[in-house]
Amino acid sequence: MVCSFGDQNDVAVFRELGLTPFQAIDLDGCMTNIAGPFAGMKVAEARKSVIEFLETEGKIHQIIEKEQEVPVSERGKNPVEIILLKEWYVRQTHIQDRIRELAGDIEFHPPRNKQFLLDWMENISIDWPISRRRWYHTEIPIWYADEGTKVICAPSGIYVQPWRQSPPENSEVLDRETRKIIGLYGKLKDDLGEIVGEEKVFDTWMDSSNSNLFVSGYLNEMDTFEKAFPTAIRPQGKEIVRTWLYYTLLKSALLLDKPGFKHVWI
């Protein structure tokens, strides 16, 4: 048996053993049907009920009280439970060496502060989760079809709200597992069944990491872009090196295989 996810080591062992995950807690913080007689209970209530049940069955040998650190949410101070959910990711682990090479072409001011970036990159071991379950931000331009086995991607360059709009006719339909393009939505829509729009939004840094591309005219003014990119300078604080700077360099490397800036002032 492997305990529920508590840290990176739990995830690593779970994957190494090839175990099949299951979800015992739902998004409302209640136990799922997998908990049997404790289904529907809040987590704290279920823990108390399990102890009472084991005591009734005479299966508790000894109870020892110990102090324990419990992670809580920043604002509500409520206990945090890790729940396994499907999210959208951008691949990044495969390109770390190339980002380091490209960072070598950037002049950092002062030079020693480049180490903030390199230290952060040493700790990257998973891909970048870019989807968030929030109410307000840039919507992820995706719809699900054919009982979730296919995804519909909006064409480049437009803004859509999938939770309230239908896919444009020239959207691409992809197999969800293989990511292979099947065809255009306009031609396939009669065979796709119910269409469900994505309700999740992008991580804020997914937008912010476009800043150097946007100001340089990427995709809109390519003549200007050829002259203006890499952007001359990025001035910023050290506390967002791991987010704003790193994700901007990541996106520049993934899209263009170029350094995002000529100078970085931290």
What are these regions (language model features)?
Residues 2-6, 29, 104, 116, ...:
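Conserved active-site neighborhood of enzyme catalytic/cofactor-binding cores
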